[in-house]
Design a protein with these regions (language model features):
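Substrate-binding groove/exosite segments of carbohydrate-active enzymes
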Residues: 231-367, 374
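The feature captures the catalytic groove of carbohydrate-active enzymes
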Residues: 192-217, 275-279, 325-347, 377-407
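A broadly conserved amphipathic alpha-helix scaffold signal in soluble, globular proteins
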Residues: 147, 353, 370-373, 377-380
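Glycine-rich, histidine-containing beta strand-loop boundary motifs that form or position
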Residues: 131-133, 159-162, 203-205, 293, ...
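Detector for glycine-centered tight turns/loop "hinges" at secondary-structure junctions
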Residues: 96, 124, 320-322, 332, ...
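Terminal accessory carbohydrate-recognition/targeting modules of carbohydrate-active enzymes
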Residues: 1, 11-248
Length: 407
């Protein structure tokens, strides 16, 4: 712990690396405190703005992103986004009353978010609550599993409702018309919990196109799929140094780098996220940076997304050697080149070469070779008198002054 605190992880809010490799915030009197984290699946991404208020209760706002529910204008930032602040536990009745006076004990990040809380009730009653929050691996939904446990000395009456809330978005603002956003509570029950007994229920936040069938999600199956995915990231390409903070940083970077892939109509597309960049690819973020990483991780979905991105850029090879677009957006049907040539061909040549070398697949390398050759020839044709490839801007896209050649 002393080593962790010296490296900045054990901060004033008592975040620590736990025995399983996750990060746990042990909540004490130093509240309120808020933070945020993004988690993604193939058809959804969610930024959780979470924290503990001055009274010790959990705060949560879900910023939901559906990358394939496209809005108008269908540009780089046209993923449907909505925020949901619904506190699911407000719907729970305990001993005929609302569930009040929550005290959060700890919050753990491990590829899911696990929140442990307690409620003190009259007559030596005490209730424990575990929230497990995570995106579906393959469905357009964010999932929440709730476990209520009687940790007191007297029986507790618990009533869990079923609930379904539907929002239909403005059809004039959607590429495919109106979208349906469905929030549900599942697991309706009324029962007595004896000391030591527990019950579970769940909530989901899903988004659909008008003609899509609503899904009935099995929360345990969804959780297992997420845990299996995270275990695959966690157990492969393990960084082992004398510094546990660096090891943990790398482990979480693997999760974020690999989970942020979306199953678009243009194929699997990795996206930076951040409530801005989805269902699109960039010559720097994807072609140059993340794609060569996936073969080392051994993540087949990542490898497929890498090959898909290079195939998209290959569409723009041309005999006149005009620049490649900086990004291919909107599920692959449009491009953005607003900063001119950022040195994008050099980025693609470098990334595609490294990907081919690290993947070690001759057939894929032969498929990529024409793109690599074209990009290198483009660079050769644009060398300046100092032997540097000329470009209009760099990756910062004129946010700062750029010259005529930008490394």
């Amino acid at each position: 712990r002393d080593a962790q605190e010296s490296r900045g992880l054990g901060d004033v809010y008592k975040r620590q690396i736990n025995s399983a490799g996750g990060i746990t915030w042990q909540v004490d009197e130093r509240v309120p405190h808020e933070d945020h984290i993004e988690m993604s699946g193939l058809r959804v991404s969610t930024v959780l703005r979470y924290g503990v208020d001055a009274n010790g209760a959990f705060m949560l706002n879900r910023s939901m992103v559906w990358p394939m529910l496209r809005t108008i204008p269908n540009n780089t930032h046209a993923s449907l986004m909505r925020r949901f602040a619904w506190n699911v536990t407000d719907m729970v009745e305990v001993n005929g009353q609302s569930l009040l006076n929550e005290k959060v004990k700890e919050v753990t990040l491990n590829g899911t978010m696990v929140v442990q809380s307690e409620y003190t009730l009259p007559r030596k009653g005490k209730l424990g609550l575990t929230r497990i929050l995570f995106p579906s691996v393959s469905n357009p939904a964010f999932c929440e599993k709730y476990i209520l446990r009687n940790i007191g000395e007297s029986a507790i009456s618990v009533e869990i409702p079923s609930s379904r809330s539907v929002v239909e978005t403005d059809a004039a603002k959607g590429v495919d018309g109106s979208y349906k956003l469905v929030s549900t509570i599942n697991g309706q029950v009324a029962r007595q919990l004896q000391p030591g007994e527990e019950l579970t229920f769940s909530a989901t936040f899903a988004g659909y196109k008008k003609d899509e069938r609503e899904l009935s999600l099995d929360i345990d199956r969804e959780l297992q799929a997420r845990q299996d995915l995270i275990a695959g990231f966690w157990d492969n390409l393990v960084l082992d140094t004398p510094d546990p903070v660096i090891n943990t940083m790398f482990a979480f970077a693997k999760i974020r780098g690999a989970e942020s892939i979306y199953d678009t109509k243009g194929g699997l597309m990795h996206g930076p996220g951040g409530e801005s960049y989805y269902a699109a690819i960039w010559a720097n973020d994807q072609a140059e940076y993340i794609n060569p990483f996936f073969p080392y991780l051994g993540y087949e979905v990542g490898n497929r997304s890498a090959l898909c991105s290079y195939e998209h850029f290959a569409r723009f090879m041309n005999p006149e050697y005009k620049p490649l677009p900086s990004s291919i957006i909107a599920e692959g049907i449009d491009v953005w080149a607003g900063a001119g040539d950022r040195g994008d061909a050099a980025m693609v040549a470098y990334g595609a070469s490294r990907y081919a070398l690290s993947k070690g697949d001759k057939a894929e390398a032969e498929k990529l070779w024409p793109l690599i050759e074209w990009c290198l020839e483009y660079c050769r044709r644009n060398l300046n008198e100092s032997g540097v490839v000329a470009s209009d801007a760099d990756e910062l896209e004129n946010r700062f002054p750029a010259g005529k050649a930008n490394l």
